[in-house]
Amino acid sequence: MNELNFRTLDLNLLRVFDEVMAERNLTRAAHNLATTQPAISNALRRLRELVGDDLVRRSGYGVEPTPLALTLWPTVRDALRQLRDSL
């Protein structure tokens, strides 16, 4: 994994990642986040570049997470929840 610069990390990328992991479908994630599927794809591309991993791969009717995505997701989900609860 690449070293992330947290000063410039777009937190929306983590929101997208969390929603994609929860839904396992880009279109549903886009709907839930009130955006478009291409915007979700673009955000995933940017996050993939940051972490140096595919994170999810297309399958049948949605996406399947990579091992790294499965490892990262609980931490990302908890961090977003803590941030949401504190604001």
What does each model-identified segment do?
Residues 1-9, 15:
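A detector for short, charged/polar N-terminal pre-domain segments
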Residues 48-65:
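A short LG(V/I)-centered, amphipathic sequence patch enriched
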Residues 18-34:
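Short helix-boundary/capping micro-motifs
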Residues 31, 49, 70:
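Alpha-helical residues within the helix-turn-helix
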Residues 13-20, 72:
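Short alpha-helical "packing" element that flanks the helix-turn-helix/winged-helix DNA-binding module
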Residues 50-51, 55, 72-87:
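Alpha-helical linker/hinge and terminal dimerization helices associated
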